[in-house]
Amino acid sequence: TVFQEFFKKAKKLNTDIIYVGGDIVHSKTQGISPELIDRLSWWFTKMAEICPVHVILGNHDGLILNKDRQDAISPIISALDNPNIFLYKDSGVYSTGFDGVNWCVFSCFDEVGWKDVRPVAGDINIALFHGAVWGSKTDVDWEIEGDVTVDLFENFEFAMLGDIHRRQFLNEKKT
């Protein structure tokens, strides 16, 4: 399968970190089947056997408009209780496990916490975000009028953006 090929390649490359940028499932909280739980448990466990796995949630992983409901991913990761899997459900600044390198999470389930996400001076700060960014393009070249602009990420050395589904640069410098 594609996943087995990915696992082989990640092992061969001696991958240090796997980052999953959300939209792991499409069903939000509806239609969660035993097969889905089984496949996700297998997928997360196999990745965690290779290296630490860092995960943020996407809009399809839970109900953005009803944040009191549990998302589809948290209970699976919690039940796995694997010390090599890290889920960042709340906005904040977290260690990547490498000295001087931080995840700066802007969670789509915790927009209130965005104001507290600030880069750490002297460190490498990687913004993680799952959502529509103004000016990004879909895989059919449709330009998105997003919820945020790239200015949200201007103080960070890097930004890894989920939800866009297409590799692209969103600034003139192509950084």
List PLM regions with ranges:
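Active-site neighborhood of phospho(di)ester-bond hydrolases with catalytic His/Asp-centered motifs
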Residues: 17-23, 52-59, 86-91, 106, ...
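Conserved catalytic scaffold of divalent metal-dependent phosphoesterases
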Residues: 61-151
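Generic signature of intrinsically disordered, low-complexity segments enriched in small/polar residues
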Residues: 6-9, 22, 97, 112, ...
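Core catalytic region of metal-dependent phosphoesterases/phosphodiesterases
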Residues: 1-94
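A structural signal for the main folded, soluble domain(s) of proteins
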Residues: 4-12, 111-113, 166-174
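Short, conserved loop/helix-junction motifs that constitute active-site signature segments
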Residues: 45-49, 118-121, 150-155, 172
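Conserved beta-sheet core of the metallophosphoesterase superfamily
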Residues: 134, 139-175
